Amino acid sequence: MKRAVTFDFWDTLVVDDSDELDRRALGLPPKPEARAMAVVEAVRGVADVGESAIRAAWDAALATFYEQWKVEHRTPHVRERVASVFASFGLESALEAQASLVEHLATMEVVHPPRLAPGVLEVLHDLRGRVRVGIISDTIFTPGSGLRRILRDHNLAGFFDAMIFSDEVGCSKPSQNIFLEAASQLGVAPDALIHLGDRGVNDVDGPRSVGALGWLYAGVVDRHPEGWGGAPKLLHHDLIPAMLDGLGVP
């Protein structure tokens, strides 16, 4: 059986919020505050609106997004959150200000990118030619286009046969649809997928729902010290080749 290995992006391929170290060194505020400040500045650039009202509208837009992500299993592009804030103040026609803000929010982690998880480059070299390799990742602020740029800047993009990002396919983990889409793009049966990620529900239960394997990666953050559903737990990417050997993958 032809196999494919897919990786989560955040806290699996890269260390989430490791960019905060660089931001701090440059005297920049943490990303949540930087985003809120940018929203306030953008709205106040086109209308006389109080800062507290803008921040409240931004918080409401974020709450709506997290409901869509966690309950509806979809992650609309950040432009929807921006549009919601502007609409709160009757500023739907301020399209230039919205577009500029969207670009800023969507590229914040591209300008100051996260660092790679240990051993990522080496394992991708090891997997090349042995299995099909993909990414299955939810997108929160940085869309799929931005995550591709981060991968290119780390010289990793060429290792992947398919990249499935939730804002582009209209569904997010643990939806069955995102794993079925990955299998389709990688040219393998769903039960030939082996997915690696740091979250039990998303990265173990999700792939298992389509007959695929889900492995926990705890090399950056161990979210499940007691394990999750008997899934293998890997503390380093260099364990993947031996795990494939154990499955009889040539």
What are these regions (language model features)?
Residues M1-F9, V15, P30, E41-S52, ...:
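Asp-based, Mg2+/Mn2+-dependent phosphohydrolase catalytic module
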Residues K2-A117:
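N-terminal helical cap/lid subdomain that shapes the substrate entry/recognition surface
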Residues A99, E103-P113, V131-R132, A162-S166, ...:
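Conserved acidic, metal-coordinating active-site core of Asp-based
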